[in-house]
Amino acid sequence: MRALVLGGGGLAGIAWETGVLTGIGDEAPEALRVLVDSEVLLGTSAGSTVAAQISSGLPIDELFARQLSAAEGAHEMNPGVSIDEIAGKFLEAMLPPEATREQKLQKIGVVAVAAATVSEPARRAVIEHRLPSHEWPRRELRVTGVDIATGELVVFHNASGVALVDAVAASCAVPGVWPPVTIGEHRFIDGGVISTVNMAAVTDCGAAVVLVPAGVHTASPWGTGVAAEIDAFPGSTLAVFADAESLAAFGPDLLDPACRGPAARAGRDQGRRESARVADFLGL
């Protein structure tokens, strides 16, 4: 099986990934078709939105147009919290160094619960509007989140008994920015706090194409970085990291709705540049 892995990266990440796929389709339509039809779609945080959107059957051109639409952007919220503020809270939660990863993630969960954010229903309404369909597709769509009680990664899918909107909302619940998502007796935060790509969730696949809305040298608090995580995948991989032009287009705040248009356009340009490499990897 082959997986299309869509990484986390805020509103900029949603726009960029949509743009990259659109750009690949501009130059290599068959490569786009094969990517979208991958046996497994894995989405983390921003990537969960894109994975759910493309699995809905809505054409990529329409999804791209939504990223450029001011009317669509008006449905998004600007949390008014800087990435630096969030990073500071995370660093505090990472102490003491001898704590296990799960213990540190539990502390991040405490930060998330204590943060002043919009209400869960208000945030859920934003996610509802993003998704063309609120039903799980019949195909294999996987969405990552973190259970704040255990600090463990949870992979939602169509047999989890969880509504798609709730799964995506959980995966996009950046701690300290958006409220944790309550599902039954559990509360969940962004799957990206463990990894922006969570390659461990697709180890049953023999190949993976990975879109990462971050630079290739992006570090991770849990290891050597996203690039190393992808390199360690047991199957074959092709990773597309945001290049310098795309990173510049993102601007200073990945959560600011104003970044959507520039990030989408930059992603489309990069997708065109990457299309031949992607097609070659897919054997086209």
Where are these regions (language model features)?
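Patatin-like phospholipase
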Residues: 1-44, 49-284
